[in-house]
From Swiss-Prot:
UniProt entry keywords in alphabetical sequence: S-adenosyl-L-methionine, Transferase
Root EC class: transferase
Function description: Catalyzes the conversion of S-adenosyl-L-methionine (SAM) to carboxy-S-adenosyl-L-methionine (Cx-SAM).
PANTHER family the UniProt entry points to: CARBOXY-S-ADENOSYL-L-METHIONINE SYNTHASE, TRANS-ACONITATE 2-METHYLTRANSFERASE-RELATED
Subunit structure as annotated in this protein's UniProt entry: Homodimer.
GO biological process, one term: tRNA wobble uridine modification
Entry protein name: Carboxy-S-adenosyl-L-methionine synthase
Residues the record lists as binding S-adenosyl-L-methionine: 40, 65-67, 90-91, 122-123, 137, 204
The keyword Transferase belongs to this UniProt entry's keyword annotation: yes
Catalytic reaction equation(s): prephenate + S-adenosyl-L-methionine = carboxy-S-adenosyl-L-methionine + 3-phenylpyruvate + H2O
Organism: Pseudomonas putida (strain GB-1)
Length: 247
């Protein structure tokens, strides 16, 4: 499957619509996220490594907000616990269709991968099976803020003792100087990856009402309120971070 360069915002738009994960985004998503999220490949590959430590036999491993299945593929490559299966969930029909294609291609290249089920569903309404690993890779930031605690509480209830939630998010910072610095460094990262000022500005307009990042402290406080006993930051690159939350 060919991967197209992200040129979605390269031409001036009279009105910039809110960002949605539609077919246009799906076509360029691998290029978009690689050029927009510093550290993304490192997070994805190591999610599988981390999951292998917490995965337990005969349990579910969830990839919530699976998009094109990069995390699911990492889980399948690294986890070897008997009887595990991956449940990849996304609410975008276009993402789910392409995700299934990528996973079929992975099956043709590798043997003895974990079985996988791909669901087109709203994770806010999803009934969770007993799970040893739940991955949310840049997903919670697209959930309405007043619905995040309830979702995390349900995930906590589904997690078995010894399991883990691995949560990756874009961060904002309470300190104004820190926020401004890391925001500018992130823009420099995008410029270095070939995005023009027009593309950066229009993408920001499209996503600012859709993605609502939290501070690290807000994440830690919410996870504790949801019933997690320990929250361990394991990765940060600029204003993007990943946490391990233990039940």
């Amino acid at each position: 499957m060919s991967k197209q360069p992200d040129r979605l915002f390269a031409q001036p738009l009279e009105q910039v619509p809110d960002f949605v994960f539609n077919e246009d985004v799906v076509r360029v998503f691998p290029d978009m996220i690689k050029r927009s999220v510093p550290g993304y490949p490192t997070i994805v590959e190591n999610l599988g490594v981390l999951a292998a430590r917490f995965a337990q036999p005969n349990t579910a491993l969830y990839d919530l907000g699976a998009s094109l299945g990069a995390v699911t593929q990492s889980l399948r490559r690294h986890v070897r616990s008997d009887g595990c299966r991956v449940i990849a969930v996304d609410n975008s029909a276009a993402m789910v269709e392409r995700c299934r294609q990528y996973l079929t291609a992975q099956d043709s290249m590798f043997q003895e991968l974990l079985p996988v089920q791909v669901l087109e569903a709203d994770i806010l309404a999803l009934p969770f099976e007993p799970a040893s690993v739940v991955a949310m890779n840049f997903t919670l930031q697209f959930i309405a803020p007043d619905q995040r605690l309830e979702l995390l509480g349900r995930i906590r209830q589904a997690l078995l003792p010894g399991g883990a939630l691995i949560l990756s998010e874009k961060l904002r910072f309470a300190d104004e100087q820190e926020q401004d610095l890391l925001n500018e460094l992130h823009l420099d990262f995008k410029r270095a990856n070939g995005y023009s000022e027009l593309e950066i500005a229009q993408k920001r307009s499209a996503i600012e009402n859709v993605m609502r990042p939290d501070t690290l402290e807000a994440h830690q406080e919410r996870l504790r309120a949801a019933g997690f006993s320990k929250v361990v930051p394991w990765f940060q690159c600029l204003n993007f971070a990943s946490l391990i939350a233990l039940p």
